[in-house]
Design a protein with these regions (language model features):
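Electrostatic, structured charged patches in enzyme active sites and in nucleic-acid/phosphate-binding
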Residues: 14, 25, 29-197
């Protein structure tokens, strides 16, 4: 489903829950717009970064960028940093060193996408890697029971999906122009690399 389709589905959901003529329709739409940052300069930020911190590579020669500013934003990123640092098949890598401009349809403005990982393997092939939970790589599923909490969660998932689609479209275009492979790495792929969490 396209981003426009998902946002449209959200609006249909609001209209189904709050009939036309109800003052709640406009309140809900304005609330949604505020939450995703359409009418102000804030960006909606999820609170799923409970595990973050600074990280220092052991193989400084492999790292491209300022090694004193490496921040992992999840235990998945930390594991992948360690994997990149130890893996002899990876000759160079960087964290948030590739910045890709994109247009965020959810906010109606230009943004910058800081790619989680840029890496180069021993064959010379470069990759952009984004680390995401599997659930954020698929369109959100409308909850069967639309409680207030479920509606809010669903709206947040729609926003996240919309932003991810915009970022990944821009990243794919840049990658294609530069002969770089773009990959989204989920918990499934990390487990194949040895992640035990």
């Amino acid at each position: 489903m396209s981003v426009i389709g998902i946002v449209g589905e959200f609006l249909l959901t609001v209209l189904a829950l709050y009939p036309i003529g109800s003052k709640n329709v406009n309140n809900k739409i304005v609330s949604f717009q505020y939450e995703i940052g359409i009418n102000n300069n804030t960006i909606y930020k999820e609170d799923n970064m409970a595990y973050s911190g600074k990280w220092v590579p052991k193989n400084l020669k492999k790292y491209r960028g300022d090694h004193t500013k490496i921040t992992y934003r999840s235990n998945w990123e930390k594991f992948f940093f360690e994997w990149l640092d130890k893996n002899p098949e990876i000759i160079a890598w960087g964290s948030e060193t590739a910045v890709i401009p994109y247009f965020c349809n959810a906010e109606g403005k230009k943004r910058r996408y800081y790619m989680d990982i840029w890496m180069k393997d021993a064959s010379g092939q470069e990759f952009f890697v984004e680390i995401k939970p599997k659930k954020e790589t698929q369109p959100p599923i409308k909850p069967a029971n639309l409680t207030t909490a479920a509606k809010k969660r669903y709206m947040n998932e729609i926003y996240t999906w919309s932003v991810n689609c915009d970022k990944w479209k821009a990243a794919s275009a840049v990658a294609e122009k530069r002969n770089i492979k773009f990959r989204v790495l989920t918990e499934d792929g990390l487990r194949k690399l040895g992640y035990k969490g």
